[in-house]
Curated annotation (Swiss-Prot):
The keyword Isomerase applies. It is an enzyme of class 5 (isomerase). GO terms for biological process: enzyme-directed rRNA pseudouridine synthesis. This is Ribosomal large subunit pseudouridine synthase C. The active site is at D146. It comes from Vibrio cholerae serotype O1 (strain ATCC 39315 / El Tor Inaba N16961). Keywords: Isomerase, RNA-binding, rRNA processing. Its EC number is 5.4.99.24. The gene is rluC. It comes from the Bacteria. Pfam families: PseudoU_synth_2, S4.
Length: 315
């Protein structure tokens, strides 16, 4: 058996920390401690705010002083190690950071990396970043992208930045552009796809359905190949698998899409070295939460995808 030990902490709550529930705050502070332990120390009154017991739903206020008790947890040797013990596997994410300042961090997420742990995954990009930056007081996802999609992922470093950026996403003022390699020749006249999407809650498959949620994606052709088209896709709404389903609906599924793709097209693109979902969040434009100035960030394609496109041009 191995042990994880933490020391007692006294934390002064500032404006950036204020507004969040104490249970969520503790789960962020005690990164490698099981959720059940967090709720146990709350229930037993070991966590104090201004020297008083609080319930899990208590919302922190600026000026609060939180006492986080020392915690010891036993971990079986055959259990997955916490992210902090897997730095050799996640350190490569440090090289994927394309922008960083005091308020936010932007990652060019590799394909195959989940944005967060869960569904059988013990850690994702956010857990890895927290392990790489143990001194960071606050790191939270602003939005999400699919595990197999690569590209831009925004992470807030302050709660005020998180609120500001998420408000922009809600108000649909954030502009996102994806690169997708789709089967066949995309019709240049097809610039907007408006098709409602409905998610099956049992198998998570999304389909175009008149009873679904309104969904809109804008498309632009970037380059045509013999049997494929590289398109730029800009989702106006943010539905699950939206670009993937809209391209399939139009008869042009994305290369190597294991849910909505075409195996014959996958075999065709494999000869050029493509063996992953060719969907990449390439560009984002938004208002910086502190400077209030418009910020545009570009995340380059992985080298092997660029090489694949070069081979397709020469074919």
């Amino acid at each position: 058996m191995n042990e994880i030990r933490t020391q007692v902490q006294f934390i002064d709550i500032d404006e950036d920390m204020a507004g969040q529930r104490i249970d969520n705050f503790l789960r962020n502070q005690l990164k490698n401690i099981p959720k059940s332990v967090v709720y146990r120390i709350l229930r037993k009154g070991e966590v104090r705010v201004n020297k008083k017991r609080v319930k899990a739903e208590y919302k922190l206020e600026a000026g609060d002083v939180v006492r986080v008790p020392p915690v010891t947890v036993e971990v079986k040797e055959n259990e997955p190690a916490p992210p902090s013990t897997k730095l050799s596997k996640v350190a490569e994410l440090e090289h994927c950071i394309v922008y960083e300042d005091d308020h936010l961090l932007i990652l060019n997420k590799p394909s195959g990396t989940a944005v967060h742990g869960g569904s059988g995954l013990h850690f994702g990009a956010i857990e890895a970043l927290r392990a790489l930056r143990p001194q960071a007081r606050f790191l939270e996802l602003v939005h999400r992208i699919d595990r197999d999609t690569s590209g831009i992922l925004l992470v807030a470093k302050k709660r005020s930045a998180l609120r500001h950026l998420q408000a922009q996403f809600r108000e649909k003022t954030v502009q996102k552009y994806y690169y997708a390699l789709v089967m066949g020749h995309w019709d240049a006249e097809c610039k907007v796809v408006n098709a409602p999407l409905l998610k099956n809650e049992v198998n998570s498959i999304v389909r175009v359905n008149p009873n679904g949620k309104p969904s809109e994606t804008r498309f632009r052709i970037l380059e045509k190949f013999a049997e494929a088209t590289l398109v730029q896709a800009s989702p106006v709404t943010g539905r699950t698998h939206q670009i993937r389903v809209h391209t399939q609906y139009m008869g042009h599924p994305i290369a190597w899409d294991d849910r909505y793709g075409d195996r014959r097209f996958d075999a065709y693109t494999a000869q050029f070295g493509i063996e992953r979902l060719f969907l990449h969040a390439a560009n984002i434009q938004f208002v910086h939460p502190a400077s209030e100035k418009k910020l545009e960030i570009h995340a380059p394609l992985e080298a092997h995808l660029e090489q694949a496109l070069t081979k397709m041009r020469q074919a």
